[in-house]
């Protein structure tokens, strides 16, 4: 989950809880099973977010939760890997053949993104 504006509150039966705000990225692996809730804690401010569900490459692993703050709001004409399966520096770990990279660019700015794995 990547919150763009507003806030999203998270609670789960693993004992995790907190508010995810703009700049925060949350990773949750259901693994062997987890009960959780996510909701907008504000009665007046809307929340805008990306929530990606990615199929894991490993089954029956322990459930887990992780969250980190990234300064992507202050990025300009740059990109940052937020989530990866190969322990890239400063990214959150997922158990899937995927990565999530976010870029922030000015209008008409060009960029190149090279895939790290030839099978994609």
PLM regions: where:
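Structural motif
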Residues: 1, 26, 51, 79-81
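Short, conserved beta-strand element in jelly-roll/cupin
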Residues: 1-9, 53-56, 102-106, 116-120
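A generic structural signal for short beta-strands and their flanking turns/coil linkers
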Residues: 4, 21, 32, 46-50, ...
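Short acidic-glycine-tyrosine-enriched beta hairpin
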Residues: 12-29, 72-75, 109, 115-116
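Ligand-binding loop in jelly-roll beta-barrel domains
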Residues: 13-15, 30-60
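Solvent-exposed alpha-helices and their adjacent loops that cap or buttress functional pockets
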Residues: 19-20, 42-45, 93-94, 115
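A non-catalytic, helix-rich entry segment at domain boundaries
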Residues: 61-66
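Acidic/His-leaning functional-site neighborhoods
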Residues: 68-70, 76-120
């Amino acid at each position: 989950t990547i919150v763009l504006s507003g806030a999203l509150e998270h609670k789960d039966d693993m004992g995790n809880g907190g508010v995810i705000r703009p700049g925060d990225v949350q990773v949750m692996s259901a693994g062997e099973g987890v009960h959780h809730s996510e909701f907008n804690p504000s009665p007046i401010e809307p929340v805008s977010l990306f929530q990606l569900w990615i199929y894991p490459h490993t089954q029956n692993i322990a459930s887990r939760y992780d969250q980190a703050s990234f300064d992507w709001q202050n990025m300009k004409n740059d990109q940052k890997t937020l989530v990866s399966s190969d322990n890239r520096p400063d990214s959150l770990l997922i158990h899937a053949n995927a990565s999530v990279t976010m870029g922030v660019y000015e209008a008409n700015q060009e960029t190149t993104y090279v895939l790290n794995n030839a099978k994609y």
